[in-house]
Amino acid sequence: MINRNANRDRDRSRSNDKELKINYRIKAREVRVIFENGIQEVLSIEDAIKKAKEAGLDLVEVSPNVSPPVCKIIDYGKYKFHQEKRQKEQKKNQKVIKLKEVRMQPKIDTHDLDFKSKNILSFLKDGNKVKVTIRFRGRELAHTYLGYDILNSILEKVGEVNYVLESAAKMEGKTMFLIVAPKFKK
């Protein structure tokens, strides 16, 4: 017989792991309680829940992996709201850096090279990393120095932007590449 709810049950258990245990869901016998004013005390779970109820607040397990587990007496709704707000703020401030790739061959014309250099420049100004790839075919492999010359000329043209050479020109099989990243101001 196939259990059709197995995936649903597994997903529920994952979401419950992220949830904090509050009040009677805490399974430990003793807990280290941090009160609103910052005072710490080791209490039995019953006493800790009683003190939380007297204050009109919740006993929230903050750090379950310590012995005894650390709990705070706080308003759970406010605590969860502030945590979600902090996560949204961190996500908003997080900068996503993409890796853009510009491909070419060693037989590239000067105008095409200028055009590709402008593209690389715009990618770097947007804050993206750029992987410049030169693909060699057939007899072109005997003239890899052309690839180094092309990559050096690109770096000279891109020199007006502050950049960091993340990996110097390397040959991997029939391709030569380098990775350039923008230098961020701190």
Swiss-Prot record:
<keyword id="KW-0648">Protein biosynthesis</keyword>
<dbReference type="InterPro" id="IPR001288">
    <property type="entry name" value="Translation_initiation_fac_3"/>
</dbReference>
<dbReference type="InterPro" id="IPR019813">
    <property type="entry name" value="Translation_initiation_fac3_CS"/>
</dbReference>
<dbReference type="GO" id="GO:0032790">
    <property type="term" value="P:ribosome disassembly"/>
</dbReference>
<keyword id="KW-0963">Cytoplasm</keyword>
<comment type="similarity">
    <text>Belongs to the IF-3 family.</text>
</comment>
<protein>
    <recommendedName>
        <fullName>Translation initiation factor IF-3</fullName>
    </recommendedName>
</protein>
<comment type="function">
    <text>IF-3 binds to the 30S ribosomal subunit and shifts the equilibrium between 70S ribosomes and their 50S and 30S subunits in favor of the free subunits, thus enhancing the availability of 30S subunits on which protein synthesis initiation begins.</text>
</comment>
<dbReference type="InterPro" id="IPR036788">
    <property type="entry name" value="T_IF-3_C_sf"/>
</dbReference>
<dbReference type="GO" id="GO:0005829">
    <property type="term" value="C:cytosol"/>
</dbReference>
<keyword id="KW-0396">Initiation factor</keyword>
<dbReference type="InterPro" id="IPR036787">
    <property type="entry name" value="T_IF-3_N_sf"/>
</dbReference>
<dbReference type="InterPro" id="IPR019815">
    <property type="entry name" value="Translation_initiation_fac_3_C"/>
</dbReference>
<dbReference type="Pfam" id="PF05198">
    <property type="entry name" value="IF3_N"/>
</dbReference>
<dbReference type="GO" id="GO:0043022">
    <property type="term" value="F:ribosome binding"/>
</dbReference>
<comment type="subunit">
    <text>Monomer.</text>
</comment>
<dbReference type="InterPro" id="IPR019814">
    <property type="entry name" value="Translation_initiation_fac_3_N"/>
</dbReference>
<dbReference type="GO" id="GO:0016020">
    <property type="term" value="C:membrane"/>
</dbReference>
<dbReference type="Pfam" id="PF00707">
    <property type="entry name" value="IF3_C"/>
</dbReference>
<dbReference type="GO" id="GO:0003743">
    <property type="term" value="F:translation initiation factor activity"/>
</dbReference>
